[in-house]
Structures are given as C-alpha cells and as structure tokens.
C-alpha cells in the first residue's frame, strides 16, 4: 500500500494515512491496458471466483497520467476558476481528459477541487505517451492550474 508520512524537524515522523488501494492516476493507466471483458471480471469478483479468471493485459501499450492541479494545492486553492480549450485535446490521438475535480457552472467547466484533471495518454513508448500528455496539458487554457514537469521523465527510455 501507499503510506503518507509527515516529517517535521522537531519531532519524529508521523503516519498520516495508509492506502491499500490505487489512486485515480494509478487506476487510470492500468484499466486501459486490460483486454479481458471488464464486466466479466467484476461479476467474477462479486461471485467470489476471481481467482479462476485469467486477466489479459496489453503489455505493449505504455500509458502516462499527468494530473493538473489548482495552484496552491494541496494547501489552499481557488474553486470556480474557468478551464478552457478542453475540446482541443480531442485532436491528439490516444489522449483522454478525465475530470476529477471539476464542475459545470453557467455553461462553463470550472475547477472544483485540488486535483482537477487527469490527462492520460497512451503510445508505443513512454516517451511518446509523455509527450502526448504534456502536449494536451499545453493546449488546456487554465490560468490557475499547474502540473509537475517530471512525470514519467525517468521512464522515457523504456
């Protein structure tokens, strides 16, 4: 699982949380690689016989997820800031914008959380997937958003 540890110079580390599940970005790069019928997998899990099912994955597809966050996240950040030009991303093949912290207000898409958009790109290489994801990020017009620039950087040669 994932654990979040807070380290303060004047005290010992404190365990803040321990997650035994994947978060959104992790899930959003695993699910598209599943080639098995997802409904069959869910039904097998419900019936308690998932151990009898072989899950088929596309091992060749490489995926990268870049999370667009509201400036100030994870501390304080503004809600209600408009996000524009999302439709332009549709021109990039094999890229999806997954809304995580958005709302639809007065006919506009606005930020409604800290982690706002997940940009998922797939390609034959991590370098190509990474380039597509950041190309999409650069098309999105959101003054109050930011991304980390190091996502999948170390995986570019794979």
Q: Predicted segments — roles?
A:
Residues 14-15, 65-67, 118:
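Structured core elements
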Residues 1-6, 56-67, 150-156:
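A glycine-rich phosphate-binding loop feature that marks nucleotide/adenosyl-phosphate handling sites
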Residues 1, 17-18, 69-70, 100-102:
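Fold-independent oxyanion-binding glycine-rich loops
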Residues 1-24:
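Conserved metal-phosphate-binding beta-hairpin within the catalytic cores
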């Amino acid at each position: 699982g994932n654990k979040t540890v807070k380290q303060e110079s004047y005290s010992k580390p404190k365990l803040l949380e321990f997650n035994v599940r994947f978060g959104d970005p992790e899930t959003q790069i695993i699910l598209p690689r599943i080639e098995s019928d997802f409904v069959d997998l869910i039904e097998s899990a419900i019936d308690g016989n998932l151990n009898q099912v072989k899950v088929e994955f596309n091992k060749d597809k490489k995926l990268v997820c870049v999370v667009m966050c509201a400036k100030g996240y994870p501390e304080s950040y503004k809600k209600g800031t408009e996000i524009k030009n999302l439709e332009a991303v549709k021109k990039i093949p094999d890229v999806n914008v997954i809304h995580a912290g958005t709302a639809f207000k007065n006919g506009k898409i606005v930020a409604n959380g800290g982690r706002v958009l997940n940009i998922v790109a797939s390609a034959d290489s991590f370098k190509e997937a990474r380039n597509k994801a950041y190309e999409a990020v650069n098309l999105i017009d959101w003054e109050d958003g930011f991304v980390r620039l190091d996502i999948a950087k170390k995986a570019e040669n794979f």
